[in-house]
Each structure stands twice: as C-alpha cells, then as structure tokens.
Curated annotation (Swiss-Prot):
Induction: Induced by PAP1. Its EC number is 5.5.1.6. Disulfide bonds: none annotated. The keyword Ribosomal protein does not apply. It is an enzyme of class 5 (isomerase). Keywords: Flavonoid biosynthesis, Isomerase. One of its GO terms (molecular function) is chalcone isomerase activity. The keyword Isomerase applies. Belongs to the chalcone isomerase family. This is Probable chalcone--flavanone isomerase 3. It comes from Arabidopsis thaliana (Mouse-ear cress). Pathway: Secondary metabolite biosynthesis; flavonoid biosynthesis.
C-alpha cells in the first residue's frame, strides 16, 4: 500500500478509507480528562468525509476561518444533518469496559433526544440495542469502534474490532438515534471531543477555500 499513516496522539490512522467511495481524514482528536493536573487520554478519534461532499453541502460557510467555524454550532448542525457519507473511527487508548462507554453514549443520546421531544418507544428500543451491543465487550487498548453513517437513509453501521477477534457489527436504523449518535461527536460546543471539533473546523475551512 505504501500509504503514510497519520499519527493522532501516537495512534495510527489511515489518511483515507474506502467505503462506497474514498473518504479522507478531515478531523482528528482525542477524548480526555485532567485528573490532578495529569491528562488522561481515553480515545483517539478520526472523522472521514468526502471533500467534494463537503463543498456541495457546506458551501454556505465558504470563506470562514477554522476558528469561526469551530465556534459556530449552526455549522456543526449542518454538518451532522448533511446527506453525505461519514465515518467516525474511534481507537481506544485507555482500557475501559464496553458497558461504561455504552452508558455514556446512551445518556447523551437519550437526554438530547428528550430535549427535542424525539425520545419515544422506538428510540428507546433502538438505543437499548446499541447499549446491548457494547455491554459484553471489553475495550482493550487499540480496540477500534467504527461508526459508518450512510448518506441518506438514517442508518448507521457500528463496527467493533479488538485484538485477535473478528469484527462484530450492528446496524442502527432509527434515524433519530442515528442523528444524535453523530452529534455526540459532531456537535460543536457540545461535542465529546473539543480537539476533534477544532480539527474538523480547520480542515473544512481549508476545503472550502
């Protein structure tokens, strides 16, 4: 292959992945927390998009600087809502139980859907399915969680790979749940990883120039 990997806090990410078409690494960062002045890193994140899709769907933000975009929640709302293929690749840095990760995701998605009066029985059932998928797993260092969001039909395929095991997959088909899962990583000031938000803003600003 000969493709140079991109290092995100010492975690290698491919600069491009092929789904139905090539998607480029346009955002990278980490989730972390500071404990007693020490930075503890949990995951490294890569966000993959097609630059031509970005130009088509986000042209309204042409001419904005990365700093302007990073502080504009309307921009990130448009990104999450845009009918374009997206892949979010999450690599585990600090080991964690899958159940802990699942609960974080569940709480965020449920609370934000409830805020918008979109949390009904169908959403609850689908979210339980997602939590159940992660429940029994152990996220060793270098395990990979992949979210592959389809362009139009509100479907997300979640993949989980860990050392020595075949990738497991789950299809999520409730558009409200899928949309809010995207926003967990792509929602500007409320995104789970501020460093990823800044990186996406800088990259998309450059693409739109």
């Amino acid at each position: 292959m000969g493709t140079e990997m991109v290092m995100v806090h010492e975690v290698p990410f491919p600069p491009q992945i092929i789904t139905s078409k090539p998607l480029s690494l346009l955002g990278q960062g980490i989730t972390d927390i500071e404990i007693h002045f020490l930075q503890v890193k949990f995951t490294a994140i890569g966000v993959y998009l097609d630059p031509s899709d970005v130009k088509t769907h986000l042209d309204n933000w042409k001419g904005k600087t990365g700093k302007e975009l990073a502080g504009d929640d309307d921009f990130f709302d448009a990104l999450a809502s845009a009918e374009m293929e997206k892949v979010i690749r999450v690599v585990v840095i600090k080991e964690i139980k899958g159940a802990q990760y699942g609960v974080q995701l569940e709480n965020t998605v449920r609370d934000r859907l409830a805020e918008e009066d979109k949390y009904e029985e169908e959403e609850e059932t689908e979210l339980e399915k997602v939590v159940g998928f992660f429940q029994s797993k152990y996220f060793k260092a270098n395990s990979v969680i992949t979210y592959h969001f389809s362009a139009k039909d509100g479907i997300c395929e979640i993949g989980f790979e860990t050392e020595g095991k075949e990738e497991e997959k789950l299809k999520v088909e409730n558009a409200n749940v899928v949309g809010m899962m995207q926003r967990w990583y792509l929602s500007g000031s409320r995104g789970v990883s501020p460093s990823t938000i800044v990186s996406i803003a800088d990259s998309i600003s450059a693409v739109l120039t």
